[in-house]
């Protein structure tokens, strides 16, 4: 039976943590003491120094030779049971088409990864004595070294599948090597782009580079760009609401690319300042000051040119103005060559070192129903290796090149309106079902795509996980703390007093600063419940009911009884860990749910853990 003294001891250990949290919350929300920039600086100090040194302090002072292996086995079994259940569930057909891998990662985080370091150690010491604090440190070691690494592996696996399925929907099985540039630290979203080279045997050698958008975002001072007109607009696009006069002459354009000139119309019989010398010259924009573009995306639709018999492309693509840009060796420009148009290989096609253009046309875009709604689809330009060809990707579909383009361009859907200028990655990537029952391979189609060999994918994921780990201060603090504890408790070596006090002066502040940082995070959020009430209820049920239930079953199966069983169940009912939320936000996998689990879970965790403590003590 829990006495009043025991209850007060628990409250005395936990309430000060909440005082620090609410003090930070009020400093931002009520009193306006800290600005968002100042909060960011405080959070960075906590992430770089306070929490890693706190982890090092606890791990380095814990005896690794006295670890309770049965307790650790119960914790490991709980996580393996959850992983096995989620893996089996993810293989089932999805009725809604929602990615099962995303939900599997989120549910694993909610059910098995509590805030053991900040909340668990002081709470369990107050409840069950100092030995339970040692057990919590052992859990922290496994979390930092094994389970957070596994989380990174799952997130990078998901990002790699999405990247491969998006960039190589039909040819992924032909990839034999994946080289990752040193500056690529994540495969998620717009952080990476790909370039492929086709070998003589038809195999693909892919290079993963940092996205040009990510590189440009690092520039502090914007500089003039010599890239002019780097987009292809349609007449139905409303990106530029102010029309201006145009000097672009479609007759010049069709003459340059080998097609016959269109019949003169009032909209086209105007002098053009856009000539072949500008189109094909590499020196057209060498000057330090960028020139104003004369291209007008709002000019009248060009007339349909007559079809040519061989070699020349048929430029009757609906609602498209084709505009080619030039590039020079500017420090801002990401493109070193000049893309030019060429025909298939017959008469009339220009041959001035031109690259061949392949157009990827979507097969399932909705047709214009005349309702006046605009349908915009973003595409991408994929720089190919080998033959120097280029692919224009309009969101996925079949590739058209050479003479085949003459037959296929006529079927271009009206819904196709805009193609972006990104060199490899789509501005808005397609939603690819990577978790369907047919996701393992086969011909690319609805819900199906091919994957590279397992060895290639494994090497890619391990490279990315390793780069994440070596940039994480907690990795070093955990490994160094474990290494020192192995040496210190084996040969009874004491840490030098200067080093010990230097670490303790910061680690002592780590607990309070971690809670203070959490309060700042809560204050900066627009809502405590960011994911909706129903999702919040489900996440709280998984966190505080499903997790402890699986932990109880695993502990009983291992043979834990008495106080050890109680400690195992209560630590599984702690609030949600912060590190899984950081991962979820970085990889954009249900960040609202994890944010709600951290914030709202922290508010209700104290009464819930006290309820478990009282019920288990009966």
Curated annotation (Swiss-Prot):
Transmembrane segments: 7-27, 39-59, 71-90, 105-125, 135-155, 479-499, 503-523, 540-560, 564-584, 598-618
Composition bias, Polar residues: 281-293
Misc: Seedlings silencing PIN3A display abnormal crown root development. Seedling over-expressing PIN3A exhibit better shoot growth, longer roots and a greater number of adventitious roots than the wild-type when grown on PEG-induced osmotic stress.
Tissue: Expressed in coleoptiles, roots, vascular bundles of leaves, shoots, lamina joints and vascular bundles of the lemma and filament. Expressed in stem bases, stems, leaves and young panicles.
Protein name: Auxin efflux carrier component 3a
Locations listed in the record: Cell membrane
Binding site for (indol-3-yl)acetate: 51, 115, 117, 148, 578-579
């Amino acid at each position: 039976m829990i006495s009043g003294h025991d209850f007060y001891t628990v409250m005395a250990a936990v309430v000060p943590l909440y005082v620090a949290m609410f003090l930070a919350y009020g400093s931002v929300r009520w009193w306006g003491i800290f600005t968002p920039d100042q909060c960011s600086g405080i959070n960075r100090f906590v992430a770089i120094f306070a929490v890693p040194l706190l982890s090092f302090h606890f791990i380095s002072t814990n005896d690794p030779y006295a670890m309770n292996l049965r307790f650790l086995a119960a914790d490991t079994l709980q996580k393996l049971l959850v992983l096995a259940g989620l893996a089996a569930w993810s293989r089932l057909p999805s009725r809604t088409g929602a990615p099962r891998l995303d939900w599997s990662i989120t549910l694993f985080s909610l059910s098995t990864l509590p805030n053991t370091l900040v909340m668990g150690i002081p709470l369990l010491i107050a409840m069950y004595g100092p030995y339970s604090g040692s057990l919590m440190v052992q859990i922290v070691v496994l979390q930092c070294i094994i389970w957070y690494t596994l989380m990174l592996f799952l997130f990078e696996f998901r990002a790699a599948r999405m990247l491969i399925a998006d960039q190589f929907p039909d040819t992924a099985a032909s990839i034999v090597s994946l080289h990752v540039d040193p500056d690529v630290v994540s495969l998620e979203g717009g952080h990476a782009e790909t370039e492929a080279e086709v070998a003589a045997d038809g195999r693909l050698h892919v290079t993963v580079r940092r996205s040009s958008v990510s590189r440009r975002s690092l520039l502090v001072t914007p500089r003039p760009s010599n890239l002019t007109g780097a987009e292809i607009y349609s007449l139905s696009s409303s990106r530029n609401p102010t029309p201006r006069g145009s000097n672009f002459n479609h007759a010049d354009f069709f003459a340059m690319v080998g097609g016959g000139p269109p019949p003169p119309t009032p909209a086209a019989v105007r002098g053009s300042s856009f000539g072949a010398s500008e189109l094909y010259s590499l020196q057209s924009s060498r000057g330090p000051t960028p020139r104003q573009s004369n291209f007008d995306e709002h000019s009248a639709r060009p007339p349909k040119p007559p079809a040519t018999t061989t070699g020349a492309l048929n430029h009757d693509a609906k609602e498209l103005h084709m505009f080619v840009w030039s590039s020079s060796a500017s420090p801002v420009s990401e493109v070193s060559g000049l893309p030019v148009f060429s025909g298939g290989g017959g008469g009339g096609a220009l041959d001035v070192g031109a690259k061949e253009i392949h157009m990827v046309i979507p097969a399932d875009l909705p047709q214009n129903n005349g309702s006046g709604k605009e349908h915009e689809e973003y595409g991408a330009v994929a720089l190919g290796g080998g033959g120097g060809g280029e692919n224009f990707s309009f969101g996925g579909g079949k590739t058209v090149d050479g003479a085949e383009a003459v037959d296929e361009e006529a079927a271009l859907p009206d819904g196709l309106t805009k193609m972006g200028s990104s060199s490899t990655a789509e501005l808005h990537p397609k939603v690819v079902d990577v978790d369907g029952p047919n996701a393992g391979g086969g011909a690319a189609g609805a819900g199906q795509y091919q994957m590279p060999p397992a060895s290639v994918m494994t090497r890619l994921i391990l490279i990315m996980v390793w780069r994440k780990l070596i940039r994480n201060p907690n990795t070093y603090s955990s490994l160094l703390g474990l290494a020192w504890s192995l040496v210190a408790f084996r040969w009874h070596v004491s840490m030098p007093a200067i080093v010990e006090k230097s670490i303790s002066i910061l680690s002592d502040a780590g607990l309070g600063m971690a809670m203070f940082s959490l309060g700042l995070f809560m204050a900066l959020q627009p809502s405590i419940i960011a994911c909706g009430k129903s999702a919040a209820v489900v996440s709280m049920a998984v966190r505080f009911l499903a997790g402890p239930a699986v932990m109880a079953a695993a502990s009983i199966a291992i043979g834990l009884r008495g106080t050890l069983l109680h400690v195992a169940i209560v630590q599984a009912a702690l609030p949600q860990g912060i590190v899984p939320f950081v991962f979820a936000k970085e990889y954009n996998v249900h960040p609202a749910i994890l944010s709600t689990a951290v914030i709202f879970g922290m508010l209700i965790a104290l009464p819930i853990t006290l309820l478990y403590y009282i019920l288990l003590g009966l």
